């Protein structure tokens, strides 16, 4: 869920990010080009509940026995790490989606 996604981002970025990215780029916000972190995350959520994770020696580790919960956790983990990898290019100013020229890719 979005709260857990925010917690994972907080673990790797030091801040609770989901709301910072709601109007960022062409993909952030449901259905919303760069970074594609949001796009990949939206596609993943569209295919999949609460899950467990931990931070072990600096890495996020998805836990639990349910394969669907692990898959959802992995969606959040990959997006959180994508945001971490792209944090140097993050611009806090909202990006007008009208500037997006490309159509959204199929998941």
From Swiss-Prot:
Q: Which PROSITE patterns match?
A: PA2_ASP (PS00119), PA2_HIS (PS00118)
Which co-factor is required? Ca(2+)
GO MF annotation: an example: calcium-dependent phospholipase A2 activity
Which subcellular locations apply to this protein?
Answer: Secreted
- Stated EC number for the protein is 3.1.1.4
A Gene Ontology biological process noted in the UniProt record is: phospholipid metabolic process
Q: Which Pfam families match?
A: Phospholip_A2_1
How would you summarize where this protein is expressed among tissues? Answer: Expressed by the venom gland.
Keyword set, alphabetical order: Calcium, Disulfide bond, Hydrolase, Lipid degradation, Lipid metabolism, Metal-binding, Secreted, Toxin
User: What InterPro entries does the record tag this protein with?
Assistant: PLipase_A2, PLipase_A2_Asp_AS, PLipase_A2_dom, PLipase_A2_dom_sf, PLipase_A2_His_AS
Q: Which SUPFAM superfamilies match?
A: Phospholipase A2, PLA2
Q: Where does Ca(2+) bind?
A: 27, 29, 31, 42
Which EC main class describes this enzyme?
A: hydrolase
Instruction: Give each disulfide bond as a residue pair.
Output: 26-100, 28-38, 37-82, 43-107, 44-75, 62-73
Keyword hit for Secreted: yes
What reaction gets catalysed by this protein?
a 1,2-diacyl-sn-glycero-3-phosphocholine + H2O = a 1-acyl-sn-glycero-3-phosphocholine + a fatty acid + H(+)
Active-site positions on this chain: 41, 76
Give me the Gene Ontology terms describing cellular component: extracellular region
What the record notes about the co-factor is: Binds 1 Ca(2+) ion.
The family this protein is said to belong to: Belongs to the phospholipase A2 family. Group II subfamily. D49 sub-subfamily.
Role noted for this protein: PLA2 catalyzes the calcium-dependent hydrolysis of the 2-acyl groups in 3-sn-phosphoglycerides.
Q: What is this protein called?
A: Acidic phospholipase A2 2
What is the scientific name of the source organism? Answer: Bothrops insularis
Q: Cite the source lineage.
A: Eukaryota, Metazoa, Chordata, Craniata, Vertebrata
């Amino acid at each position: 869920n979005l709260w857990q996604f925010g917690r994972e981002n907080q673990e790797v970025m030091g801040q609770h990010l989901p709301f910072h990215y709601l109007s960022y780029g062409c993909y952030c916000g449901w259905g919303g080009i760069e970074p594609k972190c949001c796009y990949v995350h939206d596609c993943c959520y569209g295919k999949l509940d609460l899950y467990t994770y931990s931070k072990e020696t600096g890495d996020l580790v998805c836990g639990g026995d349910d394969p669907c919960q692990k898959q959802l956790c992995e969606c959040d983990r990959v997006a959180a790490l994508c945001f971490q990898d792209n944090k140097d290019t993050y611009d806090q100013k909202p990006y007008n989606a009208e500037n997006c020229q490309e159509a959204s890719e199929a998941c």
